[in-house]
Amino acid sequence: MTDAKRAQALDLSLANKVADMALADFGHKEMQLSEREVPGLMELIRMYGVSKPLKGLRVTGSLHMTIQTAMLIKTLYELGADIRWASCNIFSTQDHAAAAIADSGMAKVFAWKGETLEDYWWCTEMALTWPDGSGPDLLVDDGGDATLMIHKGVEVENNPELLKQAYDNKEFQIIMDRLALAYQNDPGRWQRVAARVRGVSEETTTGVHRLYQLEQEGKLLFPAINVNDSVTKSKFDNLYGCRESLADGIKRATDVMVAGKVVVVAGYGDVGKGCAQSMRGFGARVLVTEIDPICALQAAMEGYEVTTMEKAVEEGDIFVTATGNYKVITGEHMEAMKDEAIVCNIGHFDNEIDMHYLETTPGCTCLNIKPQVDKWTLKSGRSIIVLAEGRLVNLGCATGHPSFVMSNSFTNQTLAQIELATNPDLERKVYILPKKLDEQVARLHLARLGVTLTTLTKEQADYIGVPVDGPYKPGHYRY
C-alpha cells in the first residue's frame, strides 16, 4: 500500500543540501581548470551573457552533479537563469562540484554521492520546488526522472486510486510514496507545475525513449527537445566519452589488467561502439552481443566476434552492458560466469544487470570491498565483482566523461534551453535541434584542437547544392 508517511517532507527553508561545504575550494579550482576544456560553453557565455535570454526563468536540472555539469550551471546562470539542481544518479555526484556550486550561489543544489533512493527522489522534488511552493519554467533532464515525477504527479492527481495500490518495484514505490505526500498536502500541485513548464531538454538515450513514448501515447505535457540525437552529442559524448570513461571506471574500481582479457560488451550502439573500442585499445579480446542486425553487422565488420550472452558468459572476464534495456544480464547468466568475473553497466539505469536476483535470491551473499565495489557469492559457489551496484560505472566508480566532450553535449543543452525559452510556438512534441546549430556546436570546439576548416567556393557550393556556410548535410545523413 502506498504510504505518504514513508516519504520525507520537503524542507523549503534549505538553501542547499550537499555532503561537505569544506570541499568548495577544491571544486572552484577544478572548475577553473576545466574552463579551457569547455570552449563551447565559454563561447555561449560570450555570445549571450549580455542579452541573457534566460533572465527571470526558473530552471530545474536533474543531471549528474559533476565538475562538467558545474560549468553548464555556470553558463545557464550567466544567461540569467534561476537554478535548482539535483543529480540524476545516486552515485554520480562529485561532492566538491556540488559544494562549489552551492558556495557560488549560482544554483541551489541537492545532491551528494551515495544517496539512498529515498534521498534521491527527495532531492529531485526539492529541485522541482521553489521556496514559494511553485515549480520551474524549464527542465534540463538526464534520464527523464524530473519529467517522470511531474507526469506521474499529474497522473495521480487525475486518478488518486493509484495511491491505494502497492508496487513491487522498490524505486517506483518510493516515487508513489512521495506523490502520496504531495497529494495529501496539495491535490492540485503537480498540475500547476506542469502548466508552468515551457519545456524540457533531454540529455540521454533512455530519457529520449521515455519522451517519445509519452508523445506517441498523447500524454506529453509540454514541449521537449531531444538533445541526445544531436550529432555533436550522440556521436561524441556517447562514443568518444565512453571510450575514455569506461576504462577509467573499471580500472579505478578494480585495478584489473585489461590486456589479454575477454570483455563482453552488450549492445553496439554509439555507447557500445565506444566501449568496444576502449577495451580493444587496452588489448582485450572483445565479444559483442546485439539484437539489431545492422549493429551486429557493423560489429562483425569491425572485427568483433558477435555472439549471444548465453555463449559469452563461458568466456568473459569483464562484462559491460550498454543497451538501455532490462535484464540483459540475468541471474542465470551470472551463475554461469567465471569465478570473479567483473560485471558493470554503462547504460543509464540499474536494471540492465538483474540486481534484484542478487539481492533476493537465497544463497547469494554480498561482501563490500570498497565503495561501489561488491563481491557477490552466488549459488554456484563462484563469485562475481559487481561495480556501482549495476549503475553507471563511469560515474559511480570514476568521474564520468572528460570536460571537452561534455562541452559538446552541454552546448547543445544550453542552445535547447534558449530555444524553449524564446520560442512560444513549440507544441507538445519532441523536437531535435536544427542541423545548422549542430554544425555551430562543432565549430565552437575546433580551435581548441588546432583544426582549420576548408571553405567551399561559391561555385563548389552551387555544384553540390548547399550554402557556403552550411548546413552541409541533409537531416537524414548518418555521419
Swiss-Prot record:
GO terms for molecular function: adenosylhomocysteinase activity. It catalyses: S-adenosyl-L-homocysteine + H2O = L-homocysteine + adenosine. Coiled coil: none annotated. Its EC number is 3.13.2.1. NAD(+) binds at residues 204-206, 238, 267-272, 290, 325, 346-348, 394. It comes from the Bacteria. Substrate binds at residues 66, 142, 203, 233, 237. Its cofactor is NAD(+). It is an enzyme of class 3 (hydrolase). SUPFAM superfamilies: Formate/glycerate dehydrogenase catalytic domain-like, NAD(P)-binding Rossmann-fold domains. One of its GO terms (biological process) is S-adenosylmethionine cycle. Binds 1 NAD(+) per subunit. One of its GO terms (cellular component) is cytosol. It is found in: Cytoplasm. Gene3D superfamilies: Adenosylhomocysteinase-like, NAD(P)-binding Rossmann-like Domain. Pathway: Amino-acid biosynthesis; L-homocysteine biosynthesis; L-homocysteine from S-adenosyl-L-homocysteine: step 1/1. Keywords: Cytoplasm, Hydrolase, NAD, One-carbon metabolism. May play a key role in the regulation of the intracellular concentration of adenosylhomocysteine. Belongs to the adenosylhomocysteinase family. This is Adenosylhomocysteinase. It comes from Nitratidesulfovibrio vulgaris (strain DSM 19637 / Miyazaki F). The lineage of its organism: Bacteria, Pseudomonadati, Thermodesulfobacteriota, Desulfovibrionia, Desulfovibrionales.
